[in-house]
Swiss-Prot record:
One of its GO terms (cellular component) is blood microparticle. Transmembrane segments: none annotated. The lineage of its organism: Eukaryota, Metazoa, Chordata, Craniata, Vertebrata. The keyword Acetylation applies. The modification N6-acetyllysine is found at residues 59, 82, 144. The modification Phosphoserine is found at residue 44. It comes from Myotis velifer (Mouse-eared bat). The keyword Coiled coil does not apply. This is Hemoglobin subunit beta. Heterotetramer of two alpha chains and two beta chains. GO terms for molecular function: haptoglobin binding; heme binding; hemoglobin alpha binding; metal ion binding; organic acid binding; oxygen binding; oxygen carrier activity; peroxidase activity.
Length: 146
């Protein structure tokens, strides 16, 4: 993915303000609620029976933090997303058998959560940069599937 200098500045500027614990848990939780078929990959997480259970689930929050920390690593290596996410792509493809479409869905949910948290600061330009980055990360995570 190619981000312009302005897009990189917009992404890194906002990312420095992101509460990874909070945003990660909310993003993964929303993915599991909005797209309930994704829950099949998280059967060991316990009660995912309704939105309140999902959003309050400590394992969802912990894994969301882990996911968002990985996304943050991608920000540090935006010019080499395939390399950055190669081992995670292999894990999700070969061992976990995750549908690669889920990566795109999670990226879109992340953008929604960021917009919710940052309001007016999440301008259309910032959104565009994050959408581009989220798609790049999703593509890198899906790389082993091709």
């Amino acid at each position: 993915v190619h981000l312009t200098a302005d897009e990189k500045a917009a992404v890194s500027g906002l990312w420095g303000k992101v509460n990874v614990d909070e945003v990660g848990g909310e993003a993964l939780g929303r993915l599991l609620v909005v797209y309930p078929w994704t829950q099949r990959f998280f059967t060991s997480f316990g009660d995912l029976s309704n939105a309140a259970a999902v959003m309050g689930n400590s394992k969802v929050k912990a894994h969301g933090k882990k996911v968002l920390n990985s996304f943050g690593e991608g920000l540090k290596n935006v010019d080499n997303l395939k390399g950055t996410f190669a081992s995670l792509s292999e894990l999700h493809c070969d061992k976990l058998h995750v549908d690669p479409e889920n990566f795109r869905l999670l990226g879109n949910v992340l953008v929604i959560v960021l917009a919710r948290h940052f309001g007016k600061e999440f301008t259309p330009q910032v959104q565009g940069a994050f959408q581009k980055l989220a798609l790049g990360v999703a593509t890198a995570l899906a790389h082993k599937y091709h």
